[in-house]
Amino acid sequence: MRLIPLTTAADVGKWAARHIVEKINAFKPSAERPFILGLPTGTSPLEAYKSLVTMHKAGLVSFKHVVTFNMDEYVGLPTDHPESYHTFMHQNFFNHIDILRENINLLNGNAADTTAECRRYEEKIKSYGKIHLFMGGVGNDGHIAFNEPASSLASRTRIKTLTEETRIANSRFFGGDVSLVPKFALTVGVGTLLDAEEVMILVTGRNKAQALQAAVEGNVNHMWTISCLQLHAKAIMVCDEPSTMELKVKTVKYFRELETESMKNL
């Protein structure tokens, strides 16, 4: 596992965006051989999306031959609802880049048969071979995507019941009213994430410190699903200073020394 200990959330976004651009450009994608990118929603990736849009407008990267798969979507929330993940992705990213509409993949939380929808999503991912890079965030309780504590580390895309803690945390997007936050969501599984060639998790804020500590210094544990990344051959944690507050000083120092070159010129 790589840990990139940066200073601010803006630094995290810039580093993540630069890494994605480097990966896409090195891959040299084409219509016949697209780059497959997994994407999250929420507060953590906002700075990364801003930086990606800026780099695209500067001519540093094209998304014309990039296919995206999003991590999750609420069940029962209309696609055009201001807090749907469809709306989030288009407003914050897709509307500002040259990605082809047919290359955007988001789970349908209004599907009549959610089990069939999850199966379709898994099959479509497999039709491309694999996701080359999956960017994600992490919840206060260590969940990735909507794989809440005690999720199977072998799980695939499925419907999940959201914990009260997650709904309370997400109520800030619904005017602070927990009752407006959907109780269910469709989400890629832990196993789906682990199948990706590379997984990059963005960790920002003091409220994520316990999750980061569990991921880096703890044992692999289904109560902290983020810890599954210890099993991945190419996992990266990109974090700001507040999120490292629960890590041992020597842990942060160790990774800072290892990643000195990669953290330059942000």
From Swiss-Prot:
GO biological processes: carbohydrate metabolic process; glucosamine catabolic process; N-acetylglucosamine catabolic process; N-acetylneuraminate catabolic process
Pathway assigned to this chain's UniProt record: Amino-sugar metabolism; N-acetylneuraminate degradation; D-fructose 6-phosphate from N-acetylneuraminate: step 5/5
The UniProt record lists the keyword Hydrolase: yes
GO molecular function (one): identical protein binding
UniProt catalytic activity: alpha-D-glucosamine 6-phosphate + H2O = beta-D-fructose 6-phosphate + NH4(+)
Activity regulation description: Allosterically activated by N-acetylglucosamine 6-phosphate (GlcNAc6P).
Active site: D72, D141, H143, E148
Keyword set includes Kinase: no
UniProt EC number: 3.5.99.6
Family: Belongs to the glucosamine/galactosamine-6-phosphate isomerase family. NagB subfamily.
Function: Catalyzes the reversible isomerization-deamination of glucosamine 6-phosphate (GlcN6P) to form fructose 6-phosphate (Fru6P) and ammonium ion.
PANTHER family: GLUCOSAMINE-6-PHOSPHATE ISOMERASE (PTHR11280:SF5)
Alphabetized HAMAP family for the sequence: GlcN6P_deamin
Full protein name: Glucosamine-6-phosphate deaminase
